[in-house]
Amino acid sequence: MSAPLQVTVIAKSGGPLTKRISLATDGSLRSDGSACVMSRGTAKRFTFSRLEQFADLIEHFAPHQAICLGGLRSDLPDEVSVTTRQKLNGAREAGVIARTSEYLIFPPGKPALALVDHDTKGMPPSVAERIENLGGLLPALLSVLPALAGVARVVRCSTSAGLFRTDTGHSIAGSDGVHAYLIVKNGADGDRFLKTLHARCWLAGLGWLMVGAGGQLLERSIIDRVVGSPERLVFEGRPLLDPPLAQDQDSRRPLAIEGEALDTVAACPPLTPLEKAKLRELHAKEVMRLAPEAAKEKGAFIDWQASELAQRTGMDLRRAHRTIKRQCEGVLLPDVVLQFDDDDLAGTTVADVLADPARFEGATLADPLAGTEYGRCKARIMRRGDGTVWINSFAHGRTVYELKSDFRTAKTELEKAANDEAPETFVRLALTGDLGEDEVEELRNIAHRRTGINKRTLDNKLKSARQRAASEEARQVAERRTAERQDPRPQLPVPLSDAEWLPTMQAVNDVLGRNCATEPPTRNVDHCVALVRARRVPSLHFLTRKADDDTGS
């Protein structure tokens, strides 16, 4: 290693930051990760120049400690207090931060650690067989990322490795997961790198879909693609074990392997259009293969959850079925309970969040479908520029949930609105609610009766609002795609149709002119990029030579 690297050591106040593992009645392992959430504690800068120092750090972690691979911002002290984003509430208190990417960062162009997290959950036999045929996990990864062979890294087995029973001395098979911390040249490219590596694993036959609790299809591969953010907690503390379980600590001893820093862009470039097409084909085949199982799981989940919801709220079973069905489709209606990480928010519903979005913005919670069984702190409440509320979840990848009113809550709100506010309230509810056209029409009729405004006028008002919303959504989507762009290659803006094209084309020509590839871009005799024109040919007869035509050849 040359340049020193930095990570952040997180210490939780008042409890563990690791899993509790116990034995179930049938002798299998029961793992409880509900404590793996942090609302208060400290963050400490840790700088190291040798991988052995990092390995020693994580080997001796206590159960209340974890790491973030991003470093504290350079203007922050070496040790700070950590609180939640809600309690910080935008304040700039000295020595106090929230565990967000505002405070924990990967400086662009600077080396850092990137986590390759291997887990076999849901792995089908075909993928397991392929890994075995390739010679194991490392050869499988090398088949996708050959440059990994010479990369400096620290490798450690999962939290549940090396378990045994003290009463019998028998070993117990735990998780065969692995954490591999790679030194990369540009930590800021880590998120793109992991997502691309995940896609390339799919192309190599090392990816799969699994059916979730709600019948949703979850995308997996031999590496976790969503651990690339600088503020994400990585749990390395020893687990809490209930008797008679114990752990052989040597089985988890980190192994430091010296080598070079990985150039993630050169070693794992963005997918080509052909590769993207192949990836879509593989996904489609997996979706078709699992469709019957997914439908069965979804139906069972809806029946069970609808029964629970009807019993809790007293609503009729038909409405409860619709609520849970929409939840499976990514739309959360008012009666759905959200499982926030903050115990003070226990029992909070979607209706509570919609009534006071500012209070909940930024709050973390469990995935609305996977629940706390999958883990806490997997999702976050977000707000768009127009005020609409949504949930960004990173459980099993990335999932978006929309929080919306249903007809009953929309009708109640409209009837409570003042007469002069009814038209605007109607438009807002029609735009943001989960409503059918018949329900929108009924809301319009209520607004008409209360205000006396012509129905056609209300329809036109809603139509104009929908057009403005569609235009704004298109603009935001374009901006978001630009901001989230994973391709690290530079881009040039396309000139407008009536603008000057020569400066842009000259820039493209200069770049391509320096291409030294075996098969460089096609160029003409003047060494400029060749211009290719497509022409519609009415008949292949026109492509033959006249002499050939005359001879009948």
Annotate each language-model stretch with its function:
Residues 116, 150-193, 233-236, 390-392, ...:
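Histidine-centered divalent-metal-coordination microenvironment in nucleic-acid enzymes
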Residues 47, 53, 62, 201-297:
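Catalytic "initiation/cleavage/transfer" segments centered on a nucleophilic residue
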Residues 126-146, 181-211, 246-247, 253-257:
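Helical (often loop-to-helix) elements that flank the catalytic cores of nucleotide-handling enzymes
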